[in-house]
Amino acid sequence: MHKKYSCLQIGIHWLVLLLVIIAWSSIELRGFAPRSYQPWMKMIHFSCGIAILVLMMTRILIQLRYPTPPIVPKPSPMIVGLAHVGHWVIYLLFIALPIIGIAILYCRGSSWIAFGLIMPHAEQANFDLADTLKAYHLLLANMSYFVIGLHALAALLHHYVLKDNTLLRMMPKKRG
């Protein structure tokens, strides 16, 4: 049994975090950018969202191949249960958010760009559905900030208070 997650799992974990930060920054800060930059910032947001979806699906498939390394010392069953619930909430959020985002853009019936490519859209716009989906997208996005914060806080609690290897299992190897 390995003491750490695989390099691939660690890489995906931190890459998803980076993409979430870029997606959030590009959409939240677009109002501060010159008007000519706004389509570019939206494209970054859309591209990051699609990349997050692909990486999260990949991460779930990899999870089936590589067992979760044990936490040492072993935490209580309640803590393990809460961790499992927290991880599945994160997986669901970061799969649902991009899917809903893609559905919003599709329903608007106008061209949108991801990765520099024109993406498909509905021939007939359905703005009511797009607006409803956008409300869910915003709600889930705001929930995700809270969940990410709890996830980071739990990792720090494990490291500094419980003094187990939870955080170390997901850290890249030291060079040297």
UniProtKB/Swiss-Prot annotation:
Reactions catalysed: a ubiquinol + 2 O2 = 2 superoxide + a ubiquinone + 2 H(+)
GO molecular function: electron transfer activity; heme binding; metal ion binding; oxidoreductase activity
Residues annotated for heme b 2 binding in this entry: 45, 137
A biological process term (GO) from this entry: respiratory electron transport chain
Enzyme class: oxidoreductase
Co-factor binding details: Binds 2 heme b (iron-protoporphyrin IX) groups per molecule.
Name recorded for this polypeptide: Probable superoxide oxidase CybB
Organism of this sequence: Yersinia pestis
Lineage: Bacteria, Pseudomonadati, Pseudomonadota, Gammaproteobacteria, Enterobacterales
